[in-house]
């Protein structure tokens, strides 16, 4: 079995070029951009989601203190979740793979599958080091 050695879909929110690509900047995307840049590691989560709990545990177990935004408790959680689903390219608002969503160094890493694949293939630690979230 082979794993991809580079992070998938990593890009800065500002590189989306809201105006340049003909995309209309909506409030959800602007909130994501702002929140994703507040800390080296940012996790958008739901407080009752077991996959979200696992990702938070992974980072905390590595000695990383992520900023966690529980969307079910956030006043704009619904807008943010819909915008995250669009960013990930998920088909529906109840898409099972949509949360958690992780940003490292302001760049979108992705949902649980991409975070775990990056961890398994060894590319997660360098991302964390580059973002200043991990000192090894």
Curated annotation (Swiss-Prot):
It is found in: Cytoplasm; Nucleus. Keywords: Cytoplasm, Disulfide bond, Electron transport, Nucleus, Redox-active center, Transport. A motif (Responsive for interaction with TGA factors) lies at residues 133-136. Highly expressed in inflorescences, roots, and siliques. Expressed at lower levels in mature flowers. Disruption phenotype: Plants show a reduced number of petal primordia and abnormalities during further petal development. Defection in sporogenous cell formation in adaxial anther lobes when associated with the disruption of GRXC8/ROXY2 leading to fertility defects. Gene3D superfamilies: Glutaredoxin. The keyword Nucleus applies. Transmembrane segments: none annotated. Its main location: cytoplasm. Disulfide bonds join 49-52. One of its GO terms (cellular component) is nucleus. InterPro entries: GlrX-like_pln_2, Glutaredoxin, Thioredoxin-like_sf. Residues 29-135 form the Glutaredoxin domain. GO terms for biological process: negative regulation of DNA-templated transcription; negative regulation of transcription by RNA polymerase II; petal development; petal formation; stamen morphogenesis. SUPFAM superfamilies: Thioredoxin-like (SSF52833). Belongs to the glutaredoxin family. CC-type subfamily. Has a glutathione-disulfide oxidoreductase activity in the presence of NADPH and glutathione reductase. Reduces low molecular weight disulfides and proteins. Involved in flower development as a regulator of petal primorida initiation and further petal morphogenesis. May mediate post-translational modifications of target proteins required for normal petal organ initiation and morphogenesis. ROXY1/TGA protein interactions can occur in vivo and support their biological relevance in petal development. May be involved in the regulation of the floral regulator class C gene AG (AGAMOUS). Interacts with TGA2, TGA3, TGA7 and PAN. Interacts with TGA9 and TGA10 in the nucleus. This is Glutaredoxin-C7. It comes from Arabidopsis thaliana.
